[in-house]
């Protein structure tokens, strides 16, 4: 994983059922259930770094995303584990997708997920062209329930996630990374 050079709050994620870092995947999805009851949204913090290829201008890429679901004291006291119990290849080359499972563009009836992806690519390409430090795209997939999906530009091919769990199994924080599998 490339170490983030800065973090920024990028907004909120609508919580429902499970949260996944593998949005837009038709198979091989991992999800995090057991979320705190009560909050319907969680703040999302993304760790960015500058990435440069050759003589091209540097662009902001994401290597880590954190969703704190409780106060810091509860998160510090929790046990952390590998929430996915292994790795999976990314569903989308060049992007990581964070969403509540029912708000994944592929799972919302009547949505054109490919049109959503084209819009995401347009937004992120525009941000690259502007040298935007906090470059990501949010797509509202279910306006009636406020459901959304957050798309992050990544260079790495793999995705993984970690959970901070209380003794009763309640998830109080999620952390997600993008990385390259060492061969």
Segments (PLM) and residue ranges:
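Intrinsically disordered, low-complexity acidic regions enriched in Pro/Ser/Thr
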Residues: 1-183
